[in-house]
Amino acid sequence: MNTLNRCALAALALVGTSAAFAQSSVTLYGRVNTTVEHQKDGDVSKTGLFNNNSRFGFKGQEDLGGGLKAGFQLESGFDSSSGASDSRGIFARQSEVNLSGGFGAVRLGRFTAESYYATADYVSMHNHDTGSSSDAFYAYVMPDANKIAYRTPTFGGLTVDAAVALHEQAVGGKNAYDLAANYNLGALALGAGYSKQGDVNQFAARALYTFGAFTVGGYVQRDEDAFVANGGKRNTFRLAGAYNMGASEFHVNVGRAGEYKNTPDSDATQYTVGYNYNLSKRTKVYGYYTRINNSRAGTYGFNQVPVGAGVDSNTLAVGIRHNF
């Protein structure tokens, strides 16, 4: 029995146990997000159907009394263009168990680094972290697996997350560390994040401001050796803006990756313009154009998949996203 069939059977089993749902407050959720795109890398072009981080998951919480709660979240990625399951594993997007209360929350398992959510995720507003228009330059240092994490209660709008990812005796492996902070002041939201594993590290800071129908934001990041081994340090920034008008959203986004100190001409720029039309709170149709211009030694590509040195890429896409 293949992985996808096992995953489907597990989903059916969970859906069928209505008593367990009632006792554990389990929720089935997900997203199907697919685009038709014309992509071009240098002189090579292709037109096709592309998955954009489609996923489904289960999450639940049990009230243990005295303000203490136990919870879990299991999330699986799949390819919406073909139906194939995530090659990394059934619940490779997220698999965690947690305890929360007045003390904050303790989390164990696999989940996305909070340093990413505190900074880059907020600034990729047009389609968040999905697809070829996603951030090509953000240095994601923290491993997702084998994590122990703690989240503080919120104090005056400030929340802090800290995590360690254990290497579990892997040959040459080192523990990784992640620290993030979010400070919400109504229309103004601030964030910062730091990650480190061995000599590879990154620090980023973000600001997002909403006024009327407009939202503007940006982040700056400094990393060391994240994309290029022994490349040295690199500075990156990204700016984004959005305007909402009824069901329509208009987005513009530009990012700039500086060259690594030990790798001359490794800099690049990414431009994105996008339009979303919200058919409902859960469903939207959208289109975007994004382009990555690499300098002579730059290798940045869509979905952070490297291309040949100096190769420029662009794509024109239309898509449908439905959340459930």
What is each stretch, according to the model?
Residues 29-35, 73-75, 109-111, 161-165, ...:
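Transmembrane beta-strands of outer-membrane beta-barrel proteins
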Residues 23-38, 44-169, 173-175, 182-186:
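Outer membrane beta-barrel
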Residues 176-278, 290-291:
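Detector for outer-membrane/organellar transmembrane beta-barrel domains
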Residues 47-51, 88-92, 141-143, 170-176, ...:
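Transmembrane beta-barrel outer-membrane domains
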Residues 42-45, 225-228, 258-262, 302-308:
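Extracellular loop and loop/strand-boundary signature of outer-membrane beta-barrel proteins
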Residues 24-30, 62, 66-70, 102-106, ...:
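Outer-envelope beta-barrel architecture signal
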Residues 18-22:
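Sec/Tat signal peptide C-region and signal peptidase I cleavage site
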Residues 148, 179, 311-324:
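Outer-membrane beta-barrel "beta-signal"
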